[in-house]
Amino acid sequence: MSLIYLVVLALVQGITEFLPISSSAHLILAPQVLGQADQGPLIDVMAHAGSLLAVLVYFRSDIVSVAMGKLALLQGRVTPGGRLALLVAASMPPIIIVAGALVAFDLVDALRSPRVIAIATLAFALPLWLADRYGRQTITIETMSFKHAALIGIAQLFALIPGASRSGVTMTAARGLGLTRTDSARFSMLMAIPVIAAFGLVSLIELVRADGMAAGASLSDGLIVAGLSFVTAWAAIAVLMRLVERIGFLPFALYRVGLGLALLVFFV
Protein backbone atom coordinates (compact mmCIF):
# COMPACT_ATOMS: atom_id res chain seq x y z
CA MET A 1 0.00 0.00 0.00
CA SER A 2 1.61 3.28 -1.14
CA LEU A 3 2.54 6.05 1.28
CA ILE A 4 0.49 8.56 -0.71
CA TYR A 5 -2.60 6.40 -0.42
CA LEU A 6 -2.07 5.99 3.34
CA VAL A 7 -1.73 9.75 3.76
CA VAL A 8 -4.91 10.36 1.75
CA LEU A 9 -6.85 7.83 3.84
CA ALA A 10 -5.60 9.33 7.10
CA LEU A 11 -6.43 12.87 6.01
CA VAL A 12 -9.89 11.83 4.84
CA GLN A 13 -10.60 9.97 8.09
CA GLY A 14 -9.27 12.72 10.32
CA ILE A 15 -10.87 15.65 8.54
CA THR A 16 -14.28 14.11 7.85
CA GLU A 17 -14.90 11.97 10.96
CA PHE A 18 -16.35 14.83 13.00
CA LEU A 19 -17.50 17.19 10.26
CA PRO A 20 -21.13 16.78 9.12
CA ILE A 21 -20.08 15.55 5.66
CA SER A 22 -19.75 11.76 6.22
CA SER A 23 -16.38 10.14 6.81
CA SER A 24 -17.69 6.75 5.71
CA ALA A 25 -18.70 8.16 2.33
CA HIS A 26 -15.23 9.56 1.74
CA LEU A 27 -13.49 6.43 2.99
CA ILE A 28 -15.62 4.19 0.79
CA LEU A 29 -14.99 6.38 -2.25
CA ALA A 30 -11.25 6.91 -1.74
CA PRO A 31 -10.23 3.43 -2.98
CA GLN A 32 -12.44 3.80 -6.04
CA VAL A 33 -11.24 7.29 -6.92
CA LEU A 34 -7.56 6.38 -6.43
CA GLY A 35 -7.89 2.98 -8.06
CA GLN A 36 -6.76 1.10 -4.95
CA ALA A 37 -8.08 -1.99 -3.24
CA ASP A 38 -10.16 -1.59 -0.08
CA GLN A 39 -7.86 -0.58 2.77
CA GLY A 40 -8.84 -3.53 4.96
CA PRO A 41 -9.59 -3.87 8.69
CA LEU A 42 -6.11 -2.99 10.01
CA ILE A 43 -6.23 0.48 8.47
CA ASP A 44 -9.84 0.89 9.65
CA VAL A 45 -8.83 0.04 13.22
CA MET A 46 -5.89 2.44 13.26
CA ALA A 47 -7.81 5.25 11.57
CA HIS A 48 -10.58 4.98 14.15
CA ALA A 49 -8.01 4.81 16.95
CA GLY A 50 -6.43 8.07 15.82
CA SER A 51 -9.80 9.81 15.56
CA LEU A 52 -10.93 8.47 18.93
CA LEU A 53 -7.78 9.73 20.63
CA ALA A 54 -8.28 13.16 19.04
CA VAL A 55 -11.78 13.65 20.44
CA LEU A 56 -10.69 12.35 23.84
CA VAL A 57 -7.82 14.85 23.95
CA TYR A 58 -9.84 17.80 22.63
CA PHE A 59 -12.70 17.26 25.07
CA ARG A 60 -10.47 16.08 27.90
CA SER A 61 -12.19 18.33 30.45
CA ASP A 62 -15.55 16.76 29.59
CA ILE A 63 -14.00 13.28 29.70
CA VAL A 64 -12.52 13.88 33.15
CA SER A 65 -15.84 15.33 34.33
CA VAL A 66 -17.72 12.29 33.01
CA ALA A 67 -15.26 9.89 34.63
CA MET A 68 -15.58 11.62 37.99
CA GLY A 69 -19.33 11.83 37.51
CA LYS A 70 -19.58 8.08 37.01
CA LEU A 71 -17.79 7.52 40.30
CA ALA A 72 -20.21 9.93 41.96
CA LEU A 73 -23.16 8.05 40.46
CA LEU A 74 -21.90 4.86 42.07
CA GLN A 75 -22.04 6.73 45.37
CA GLY A 76 -25.59 7.91 44.72
CA ARG A 77 -24.70 11.48 43.76
CA VAL A 78 -25.56 13.15 40.44
CA THR A 79 -22.99 15.68 39.29
CA PRO A 80 -22.93 17.61 35.98
CA GLY A 81 -20.40 15.09 34.67
CA GLY A 82 -22.54 12.17 35.78
CA ARG A 83 -25.59 13.69 34.15
CA LEU A 84 -23.64 14.17 30.91
CA ALA A 85 -22.63 10.51 31.03
CA LEU A 86 -26.28 9.53 31.44
CA LEU A 87 -27.33 11.79 28.54
CA VAL A 88 -24.81 10.15 26.22
CA ALA A 89 -25.90 6.72 27.45
CA ALA A 90 -29.54 7.61 26.77
CA SER A 91 -28.68 8.33 23.13
CA MET A 92 -26.99 4.97 22.51
CA PRO A 93 -29.65 2.17 22.60
CA PRO A 94 -31.08 2.71 19.07
CA ILE A 95 -27.71 2.59 17.29
CA ILE A 96 -26.49 -0.32 19.42
CA ILE A 97 -29.57 -2.42 18.66
CA VAL A 98 -29.86 -1.67 14.95
CA ALA A 99 -26.14 -1.67 14.15
CA GLY A 100 -25.76 -4.89 16.13
CA ALA A 101 -28.50 -6.50 14.06
CA LEU A 102 -26.85 -5.37 10.81
CA VAL A 103 -23.53 -6.86 11.90
CA ALA A 104 -25.17 -10.08 13.11
CA PHE A 105 -26.97 -10.59 9.80
CA ASP A 106 -23.97 -9.44 7.73
CA LEU A 107 -25.86 -6.52 6.21
CA VAL A 108 -23.31 -3.79 6.90
CA ASP A 109 -22.17 -3.58 3.27
CA ALA A 110 -25.67 -3.79 1.77
CA LEU A 111 -25.90 -0.04 1.12
CA ARG A 112 -22.24 0.71 0.41
CA SER A 113 -22.59 1.92 -3.17
CA PRO A 114 -21.71 5.23 -4.87
CA ARG A 115 -25.36 5.74 -5.86
CA VAL A 116 -26.58 5.47 -2.26
CA ILE A 117 -23.75 7.71 -1.05
CA ALA A 118 -24.54 10.38 -3.64
CA ILE A 119 -28.26 10.39 -2.88
CA ALA A 120 -27.76 10.41 0.90
CA THR A 121 -25.16 13.16 0.68
CA LEU A 122 -27.64 15.35 -1.18
CA ALA A 123 -30.73 14.32 0.78
CA PHE A 124 -29.31 15.18 4.20
CA ALA A 125 -27.87 18.56 3.16
CA LEU A 126 -31.18 20.46 3.22
CA PRO A 127 -32.31 19.25 6.68
CA LEU A 128 -28.93 20.30 8.08
CA TRP A 129 -29.31 23.82 6.73
CA LEU A 130 -33.00 24.13 7.67
CA ALA A 131 -32.42 22.96 11.24
CA ASP A 132 -29.56 25.40 11.64
CA ARG A 133 -31.36 28.29 9.94
CA TYR A 134 -34.66 28.01 11.78
CA GLY A 135 -33.76 26.07 14.93
CA ARG A 136 -33.75 28.02 18.19
CA GLN A 137 -30.62 28.32 20.31
CA THR A 138 -32.21 28.10 23.74
CA ILE A 139 -30.97 24.74 25.05
CA THR A 140 -27.52 23.77 26.24
CA ILE A 141 -26.10 20.40 27.22
CA GLU A 142 -26.60 21.43 30.83
CA THR A 143 -30.32 22.09 30.28
CA MET A 144 -31.19 19.43 27.68
CA SER A 145 -33.48 16.62 28.77
CA PHE A 146 -33.10 12.87 28.47
CA LYS A 147 -35.90 13.02 25.90
CA HIS A 148 -33.70 15.29 23.77
CA ALA A 149 -30.82 12.83 24.09
CA ALA A 150 -33.04 9.89 23.13
CA LEU A 151 -34.40 11.72 20.08
CA ILE A 152 -30.89 12.59 18.91
CA GLY A 153 -30.00 8.94 19.41
CA ILE A 154 -32.90 7.87 17.21
CA ALA A 155 -31.78 10.34 14.54
CA GLN A 156 -28.33 8.74 14.68
CA LEU A 157 -29.83 5.64 13.04
CA PHE A 158 -29.77 7.49 9.72
CA ALA A 159 -25.97 7.42 10.00
CA LEU A 160 -26.12 3.75 9.04
CA ILE A 161 -26.83 4.97 5.50
CA PRO A 162 -23.44 5.67 3.86
CA GLY A 163 -23.30 9.34 2.99
CA ALA A 164 -25.78 10.47 5.65
CA SER A 165 -23.02 11.33 8.17
CA ARG A 166 -23.29 10.41 11.83
CA SER A 167 -22.19 13.84 12.96
CA GLY A 168 -24.45 15.43 10.34
CA VAL A 169 -27.67 13.73 11.41
CA THR A 170 -26.99 14.16 15.13
CA MET A 171 -26.12 17.84 14.75
CA THR A 172 -29.20 18.32 12.58
CA ALA A 173 -31.40 16.71 15.23
CA ALA A 174 -29.79 18.70 18.03
CA ARG A 175 -30.25 22.00 16.21
CA GLY A 176 -33.82 21.08 15.32
CA LEU A 177 -34.53 20.47 19.00
CA GLY A 178 -33.16 23.89 19.91
CA LEU A 179 -29.63 23.20 21.14
CA THR A 180 -27.09 25.92 20.55
CA ARG A 181 -24.74 25.47 17.63
CA THR A 182 -21.67 24.82 19.75
CA ASP A 183 -23.44 22.41 22.09
CA SER A 184 -25.01 20.59 19.13
CA ALA A 185 -21.52 19.95 17.81
CA ARG A 186 -20.12 19.19 21.25
CA PHE A 187 -22.81 16.66 22.17
CA SER A 188 -22.53 15.02 18.75
CA MET A 189 -18.81 14.51 19.22
CA LEU A 190 -19.21 13.17 22.75
CA MET A 191 -21.76 10.72 21.32
CA ALA A 192 -19.12 9.74 18.77
CA ILE A 193 -16.80 8.32 21.43
CA PRO A 194 -18.71 5.08 22.17
CA VAL A 195 -19.75 4.76 18.51
CA ILE A 196 -16.19 5.05 17.18
CA ALA A 197 -14.99 2.67 19.88
CA ALA A 198 -17.66 0.13 18.92
CA PHE A 199 -16.95 0.30 15.19
CA GLY A 200 -13.24 0.12 15.92
CA LEU A 201 -13.91 -3.05 17.90
CA VAL A 202 -15.84 -4.52 14.96
CA SER A 203 -12.91 -3.71 12.66
CA LEU A 204 -10.55 -5.28 15.19
CA ILE A 205 -12.61 -8.48 15.17
CA GLU A 206 -12.44 -8.48 11.36
CA LEU A 207 -8.69 -7.98 11.62
CA VAL A 208 -8.33 -11.01 13.88
CA ARG A 209 -10.43 -13.07 11.50
CA ALA A 210 -8.23 -11.90 8.63
CA ASP A 211 -5.27 -13.38 10.51
CA GLY A 212 -3.59 -10.11 11.35
CA MET A 213 -3.14 -8.25 8.10
CA ALA A 214 -5.38 -7.40 5.16
CA ALA A 215 -5.17 -5.66 1.79
CA GLY A 216 -1.38 -5.47 1.95
CA ALA A 217 -1.35 -3.31 5.08
CA SER A 218 1.41 -3.60 7.66
CA LEU A 219 1.66 -2.39 11.25
CA SER A 220 3.82 0.53 10.12
CA ASP A 221 1.11 1.48 7.63
CA GLY A 222 -1.42 1.43 10.45
CA LEU A 223 0.73 3.59 12.73
CA ILE A 224 1.13 6.19 9.98
CA VAL A 225 -2.63 6.30 9.50
CA ALA A 226 -3.30 6.50 13.25
CA GLY A 227 -0.87 9.37 13.77
CA LEU A 228 -2.10 11.42 10.83
CA SER A 229 -5.74 10.70 11.68
CA PHE A 230 -5.16 11.99 15.21
CA VAL A 231 -3.55 15.25 14.08
CA THR A 232 -6.07 16.01 11.34
CA ALA A 233 -9.07 15.00 13.47
CA TRP A 234 -7.96 17.26 16.31
CA ALA A 235 -7.51 20.15 13.87
CA ALA A 236 -10.89 19.45 12.24
CA ILE A 237 -12.66 19.52 15.62
CA ALA A 238 -11.01 22.82 16.50
CA VAL A 239 -12.03 24.36 13.17
CA LEU A 240 -15.58 22.98 13.43
CA MET A 241 -16.16 24.40 16.90
CA ARG A 242 -15.02 27.85 15.82
CA LEU A 243 -16.82 27.77 12.49
CA VAL A 244 -20.25 26.73 13.76
CA GLU A 245 -20.10 29.40 16.46
CA ARG A 246 -19.36 32.17 13.98
CA ILE A 247 -21.07 31.04 10.76
CA GLY A 248 -23.21 27.98 11.43
CA PHE A 249 -23.62 24.84 9.35
CA LEU A 250 -24.30 26.41 5.94
CA PRO A 251 -20.76 25.75 4.57
CA PHE A 252 -21.17 22.04 5.30
CA ALA A 253 -24.61 21.90 3.71
CA LEU A 254 -23.23 23.54 0.56
CA TYR A 255 -20.29 21.14 0.50
CA ARG A 256 -22.68 18.20 0.70
CA VAL A 257 -24.64 19.52 -2.27
CA GLY A 258 -21.48 19.94 -4.32
CA LEU A 259 -20.13 16.53 -3.35
CA GLY A 260 -23.45 14.81 -3.99
CA LEU A 261 -23.78 16.32 -7.46
CA ALA A 262 -20.17 15.45 -8.29
CA LEU A 263 -20.75 11.86 -7.21
CA LEU A 264 -23.86 11.59 -9.34
CA VAL A 265 -21.95 12.83 -12.39
CA PHE A 266 -18.83 10.79 -11.71
CA PHE A 267 -20.29 7.47 -10.58
CA VAL A 268 -23.95 7.22 -11.56
From Swiss-Prot:
InterPro entries: UppP
Main localization of the protein described in the UniProt heading: membrane
Cellular compartments per GO CC: plasma membrane
Key words, A-Z: Antibiotic resistance, Cell inner membrane, Cell membrane, Cell shape, Cell wall biogenesis/degradation, Hydrolase, Membrane, Peptidoglycan synthesis, Transmembrane, Transmembrane helix
Subcellular location: Cell inner membrane
UniProt-listed Enzyme Commission number(s): 3.6.1.27
Gene Ontology MF term list: undecaprenyl-diphosphatase activity
Extra facts: Bacitracin is thought to be involved in the inhibition of peptidoglycan synthesis by sequestering undecaprenyl diphosphate, thereby reducing the pool of lipid carrier available.
Residues making up the signal peptide according to the UniProt record: none
Family the entry assigns: Belongs to the UppP family.
Transmembrane segments: 1-21, 39-59, 85-105, 110-130, 144-164, 187-207, 221-241, 247-267
Catalytic reaction list: di-trans,octa-cis-undecaprenyl diphosphate + H2O = di-trans,octa-cis-undecaprenyl phosphate + phosphate + H(+)
Chain coiled-coil ranges: none
Membrane association type: Multi-pass membrane protein
Function: Catalyzes the dephosphorylation of undecaprenyl diphosphate (UPP). Confers resistance to bacitracin.
GO biological process: cell wall organization; peptidoglycan biosynthetic process; regulation of cell shape; response to antibiotic
Name recorded for this polypeptide: Undecaprenyl-diphosphatase
